[in-house]
């Protein structure tokens, strides 16, 4: 089976940098994969992607060594199993609040006896090569999101759940959980303190920690802190920001940001 070099990096305490994809374009996915990211995450929760889009985008990504990851729309075993059968090497599960919900995510990612995943890997065997059924339980990354007040109360039980490979912070929903305004890359002291607490708890439990960013500044900050899975930006975000800046420069000679919109997606 083709190894999951991203999961190997996390297990070896090495960082990885990826990008978020919310535009339904296999060409965009292929382009960003060839840019050299460690992984690309296809967003079925907030992106405009359905299963057919995700399958085509993963096929495009497979022309490179970039690892395909999918954020499913919900903690639903059917959704998780379906994208794994299509070739995802990792699943990001949103809004996980407690140990029971973490176990639900894990068991959907694992074949028996470790889980309840139904056997029918379909395209996954074309991507992975021989040995998928035997090795998948050790190569598929299960990533659960920490982004609610309930999850913050249950960090230890979530992170100690066997089979959880990483936790991933959604900064905007985390801001809601802290009664703060969502603002993308967030410098509010309470937000910063909470992000650090989540990271340190993950380190204590020996699992990887990830976080969404929209800038080089915050990406470098989080890498320096010890995050293993850092999102540098998104297809939609890069396209919109650069287009806006170039247009403003052409019209006014001003290259500064023209919007307070900090949308990651």
Predicted regions and their residues:
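Expand to "…catalyze enediolate/carbanion chemistry for C-C bond making/breaking, isomerization
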Residues: 1-265
């Amino acid at each position: 089976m083709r190894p999951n070099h991203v999961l190997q990096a996390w297990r070896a305490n090495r960082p990885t940098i990826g990008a978020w994809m919310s535009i339904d374009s296999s060409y965009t996915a292929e382009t960003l994969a060839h840019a050299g990211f460690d992984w690309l995450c296809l967003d079925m929760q907030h992106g405009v992607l359905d299963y057919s889009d995700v399958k085509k985008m993963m096929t495009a990504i497979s022309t490179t060594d970039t690892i395909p990851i999918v954020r499913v729309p919900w903690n639903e075993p059917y959704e998780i199993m379906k994208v794994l059968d299509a070739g995802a090497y990792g699943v990001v599960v949103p809004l996980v609040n407690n140990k029971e919900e973490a176990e639900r995510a894990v068991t959907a990612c694992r074949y028996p006896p470790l889980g309840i995943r139904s056997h029918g890997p379909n395209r996954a065997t074309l991507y992975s090569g021989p040995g998928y059924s035997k090795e998948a339980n050790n190569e598929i990354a299960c990533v659960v999101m920490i982004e609610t007040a309930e999850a913050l109360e249950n960090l230890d039980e979530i992170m100690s759940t066997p089979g959880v490979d990483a936790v991933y912070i959604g900064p905007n929903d985390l801001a809601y959980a802290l009664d703060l305004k969502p603002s993308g890359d967030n410098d509010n002291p309470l937000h910063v303190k909470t992000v650090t607490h989540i990271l340190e708890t993950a380190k204590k439990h020996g699992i990887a920690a990830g976080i969404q960013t929209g800038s080089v500044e915050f990406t470098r900050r989080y890498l320096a802190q010890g995050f293993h899975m850092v999102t540098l930006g998104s297809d939609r975000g890069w396209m919109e920001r650069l287009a806006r800046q170039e247009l403003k420069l052409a019209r006014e000679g001003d290259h500064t940001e023209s919007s307070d919109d900090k949308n990651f997606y």
